[in-house]
Amino acid sequence: MNYKMMGRLIAQILLAEAAFMVPALIISLAGQDSQAILGFALSILVILAVAGMLMFFARRAKKGFYAREGMVCVGLAWIVMSLLGCLPFWISREIPSYLDGLFEIVSGFTTTGASILSNVEGLSNGMLYWRSFSHWVGGMGVLVFLLAVVPVSGRNDGFTMHLLRAESPGPNVAKLVPRIRSTAGILYILYIVLTVVDFLFLLAGKMPVLEAVCTAFGTAGTGGFGVKNDSMASYSPYIQNVCTVFMLLFGVNFSCYYLLIMKQVKSVYKDEELRLYVGMVLGSVLLIVINLRGFYGTFEETVRHAFFQVASIVTTTGFATTDFDLWPGFSKAILLCLMVVGACAGSTGGGFKCGRLLLVFKSLRRNIQKMLRPQRIQAVRSNKQVVSEKVLENTNAYLAAYVLIIMFSLLVISIDGFSVGTNFSAVLACFNNIGPGLELVGPTCNFSVYSSLAKIVLIFDMLAGRLEIFPILILLSRDTWRR
């Protein structure tokens, strides 16, 4: 295990985290929020000190770096980044409990959007910015940012691929161009452009600048931290519709946008995962609109809320324009199903992913056909390409781990004594990086009702869900740390 190289990478991530806090510090200085200024200033100093110690430890690091190190490095980096990223909340006392602050920042970095805050509007502007910016950083991945922007000594394509595979969502990682660093750069350019366009559309709707920035960050990262207690409910229909469109856009595999730029429209049109994603959204909206007849005053309002909530849940953003916990049971069941499926692989969205769902169904169909015709050899194909047995094996392992973690988490947090509906939706909301659940953790409530043990379990769920389970589970394996 190349501990020194991992230490150097984590140090560089912490340096980036300290730099990310500077705009929040400037906003706090402009607002003369003394506690927030103290929180960010001390946090930056602590992070720089830890980064300095890691850099000292990592001097003369060897360049060898393999898949195991990649997984371990990603898992450790996200944990350390979260443990230090919550310091501004705690030092400023805007969130007095360190565990609550950790829950909040993990929810931010993992783009979950689950909160322990009853009064979001009570936070200072700097804290609101930092809270939302954590979504934007976590959406595409801090290590993808590192690979795209920060020069790392001794880096090569094998090295970067191990990191990209460990942090990127989906059953497989595809190169857009031959060099991995260029792929990471293209992803971030697309991400930045879409975020800026979203921000400009929000400004056009007369949304205040800071609110537009925070909302754009939350939409781009499909995170869902709002700056108002009622999330998006008090904004105009125009702003709600803008958010709906951009949530759906950020739920699409970013390679589709690259193919469109390369004028490969036919490839995008024939993409099976994209077709499933679009069909799922349209079908869900249609069924919910039918189920909500007479629930709202006008048909336009019904369609707007249905489209917004479907987009918010399927992309795992978690914004809300209405209390969907009051919807009929059938509509809530649709939303629960969308929580599980999630967005496309290669997007900023969470969940099981449409791509994985397709592979599971195709693998199931092949197994049934094998039972009927044992002598027949049939490959599983995705977009007319044969899917390797290794990818199918990893997908099945992911499904097994996915179900087991949900079962374990549900059992542990049920100790608190809340209803099965509250606990099950809380686990789904955190593990799939969605945010709001149902009942006591619905869109008008928060997660402060849970005990410290339950919050720790949900923090684990958020990290495991964002990092696609294995980088976190590998940290818990004894074999990982053996020579």
What are these regions (language model features)?
Residues M1-R483:
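Membrane-proximal intracellular helices of multi-pass ion channels
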